[in-house]
């Protein structure tokens, strides 16, 4: 497409998003000190930061659901390379007090074979971890699909899982096709393709519906899953850059009143989110009123956002998560 034929995209200022607390039987009743939230009846296992039902909290679109906003303004939010009008990423915190089911996610091809819009590749950034915390990630080298099937049938699947110790600050990549399970002992910031397609392989006899045949079909014996070493650059630390998303730590100079936030590359702008893993910040621009980012809060930065500066209000650990379009690169 030539530059002359590109559509005119309206500017959209950054905005805060209200979190959504999602019930999970394996979650926690009390999310303090992470969030000032105590569950009424059912435990909370996930805090969705960018779910379709999350509400826009600030700006001219305050009160709308995030899903509705994506339907109404796909180009302003996602940029000129948007391939559809839906939200590309689901970002959430995960709080587990017991082992989650062993599961596997399909890739785009397999998900679409069974009528889904896309597969699910994801990553976990470890916000906190107890000593000896682990996750199950992938299969041991000598495991075959027949071993997996027999392990499901006789309750010994866990013996085939690769157990990965995790520490605060680890970025764990979980590509589609990787058998995995989150275990208790850590708090994870998950970034995933926006998809609810999960094939449950094994659930320790707890009665949840299993998808054994599809999970076996989706399983890859060898994947790229694992802890990704960070790439330290002068203006940011790249925790991961994948086909679907990038996750970066952004330093903010506390010796200055504010730091102008640059995009992660000179390519076509895309949607990104700013998450305060700790501390708080304020973003400001001549184009919009100052916007505060509280601890564990999130701000959406549309592709067509004006340039702004970030001020560290104390103890800021700033994470930027950006959508990627497969095949486009950055």
Name the predicted role of every residue range.
Residues 1-143, 195, 204-225, 247, ...:
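Transition-metal
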């Amino acid at each position: 497409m030539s530059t002359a034929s590109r559509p005119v995209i309206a500017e959209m200022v950054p905005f805060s998003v209200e979190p959504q607390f999602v019930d999970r039987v394996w979650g926690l009743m009390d999310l303090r000190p992470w969030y000032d939230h105590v569950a009424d009846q059912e435990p909370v296992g996930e805090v969705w930061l960018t779910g379709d039902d999350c509400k826009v909290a600030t700006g001219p679109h305050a009160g709308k659901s995030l899903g509705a906003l994506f339907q109404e303004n796909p180009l302003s939010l996602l940029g000129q390379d948007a391939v559809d009008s839906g939200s590309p990423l689901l970002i959430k915190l995960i709080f587990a007090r017991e082992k989650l089911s062993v599961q596997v996610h399909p890739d785009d091809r397999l998900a679409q074979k069974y009528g889904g819009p896309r597969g699910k590749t994801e990553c976990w950034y470890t916000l906190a971890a107890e000593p000896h915390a682990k996750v199950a990630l992938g299969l041991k080298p000598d495991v075959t699909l027949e071993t997996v099937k027999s392990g499901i049938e006789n309750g010994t699947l866990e013996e085939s899982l690769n157990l990965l110790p995790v520490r605060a600050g680890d970025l764990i990549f979980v590509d589609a096709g990787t058998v995995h399970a989150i275990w208790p002992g850590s708090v994870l910031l998950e970034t995933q393709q926006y998809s609810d397609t999960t094939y449950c392989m094994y659930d320790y006899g707890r009665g949840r519906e299993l998808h054994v045949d599809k999970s076996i079909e989706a399983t890859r014996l060898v994947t790229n899953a694992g802890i990704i070493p960070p790439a330290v650059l002068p203006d940011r630390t790249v925790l991961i850059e994948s086909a679907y998303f990038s996750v970066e730590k952004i330093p903010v100079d506390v010796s200055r009143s504010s730091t102008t936030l640059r995009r992660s590359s000179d390519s076509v702008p895309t949607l990104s989110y700013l998450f305060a893993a700790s501390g708080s910040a304020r973003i400001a621009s001549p184009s919009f009123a100052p916007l505060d980012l509280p601890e564990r809060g999130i701000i959406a930065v549309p592709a067509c956002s004006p340039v702004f500066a970030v001020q560290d209000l104390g103890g800021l650990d700033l994470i930027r998560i950006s959508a990627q379009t497969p095949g486009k690169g950055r």
